[in-house]
């Protein structure tokens, strides 16, 4: 069985190259550090803000948002090594100045970090 060949033995050829909207984007993960973001051109010429680094999170406490400084990444369910690298991903547990919190959004897609408080500092 030769992959990519016809029964006659000839090669299959692509009809066309990939279009811009079909190409995958570069994989990015926000990491802990001084706030740094980037704007990308997306479909129909709009701009999308992606987060590259951040040390601030919007934390929801009893229905009200409050900014807090991120101190450390405790755990990430995607990969335990991401926590060691201080990568900020959805549903990662982070240590903030207000206490432990869980990230509820996708920071690299939205350009900010939203989280809910799980455990308060005493």
Predicted regions span which residues?
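Ribosome-associated RNA-binding proteins
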Residues: 1-122
């Amino acid at each position: 069985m030769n992959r990519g060949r016809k029964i006659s033995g000839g090669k299959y050829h692509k009809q066309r190259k990939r279009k811009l909207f079909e190409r995958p984007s570069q994989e990015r993960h926000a990491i802990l550090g001084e706030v740094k973001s980037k704007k990308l051109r997306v479909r129909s010429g709009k701009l999308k803000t992606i987060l590259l680094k951040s040390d601030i999170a919007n934390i929801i406490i009893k229905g009200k948002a409050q900014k807090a400084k991120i101190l450390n990444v405790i755990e990430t369910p995607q990969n335990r090594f991401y926590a060691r690298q201080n990568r900020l991903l959805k549903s990662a547990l982070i240590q903030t100045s207000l206490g432990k919190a869980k990230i509820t959004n996708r920071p690299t897609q939205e350009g900010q970090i939203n989280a809910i408080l799980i455990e308060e500092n005493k």
